[in-house]
């Protein structure tokens, strides 16, 4: 009987740990462009890692509007769009003041509308196959199932670090 209680206690603790892990809120996102990987963190602890597709010109930081590059630097999630043409999207606060200055020095605009998003309805069937190539205009793309999970885990105000 005592052994059974201990076993039940261990199962209960494990279940509570799983529930806590799935309800933790992300406080930082790290995107490693070279690895095509996005990691959600909470208090320095990895919550989840996703494979991603990037801008169609993935090497180097975004410099000007229309260059199809994914930015590099430190940003925040400053808005969520539940009516996105890409299922759901989280807006990244690009361009920063530094990004604006760099583009201005080239006589150009820095661009904007950089998001973490899912797949447009006509392409949702592709699921993880969409990652076979970098195809966005500079955004970070995941599957629709993944963006639904990310949507729940990432609040507005979350820090985003995009590394080469």
PLM segments and residue spans:
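Bacterial N-terminal signal peptides that target proteins for export
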Residues: 1-9
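Bacterial Sec-dependent signal peptides at the C-terminal "C-region" and cleavage site
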Residues: 12-25
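N-terminal post-signal-peptidase region of extra-cytosolic proteins
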Residues: 22-27, 33-34, 54-79, 97-102, ...
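Well-ordered beta-strand positions in beta-sheet-rich domains
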Residues: 28, 49-51, 74, 113, ...
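Short Gly/aromatic-enriched secondary-structure transition segments
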Residues: 45-57
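Exported/periplasmic cell-wall-interacting domains
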Residues: 79-164
